[in-house]
Amino acid sequence: GRQTQVFAEALDASSTTLEERAGVIASCYVDCVLLQGREIPGVIAALSSSPELEALKRKYEAIFLDKCRAALAPFGQVSQAGLRAMLGAAEALSHAAASGEISREEAQQELLATILAMVSRSRS
């Protein structure tokens, strides 16, 4: 939907440094969850309870992960496991920010560090 478009445009507009691309991924993901509001954890739980909605969620996750893989490809071959770990961190940090447990900035900084570490592991 709309968030996917915003994310794609932000990635296209970002410079070619790893830090900037990773920063776009981190800030877009967290902001997307915060924009959708505090009901998101409940929505995610509801999505998981229905096979059709679970399939839709997986489809959107696959699109997001493909975009991330492509954006980070110049800096290293990121594994599917690494991308899944990043997504798990992104969800957990975004929900913690949405519930007020941590700040938006803390969520984005931690996610950025997670992405940078994932890419650096893929290089070795």
Regions found by a protein language model. Name each.
Residues 1-23:
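Amphipathic alpha-helical linker/stalk segments
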Residues 2-5, 23-24, 28-35, 51-74, ...:
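Amphipathic alpha-helical packing segments from all-alpha helical-bundle domains
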Residues 4, 8-11, 30, 87-98:
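Regular secondary-structure segments
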Residues 14-18, 36, 50, 75, ...:
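Short coil/turn helix-boundary motifs
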Residues 41, 45, 54, 72-118, ...:
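Hydrophobic/aromatic-rich alpha-helical bundle segments in the mid-to-C-terminal region
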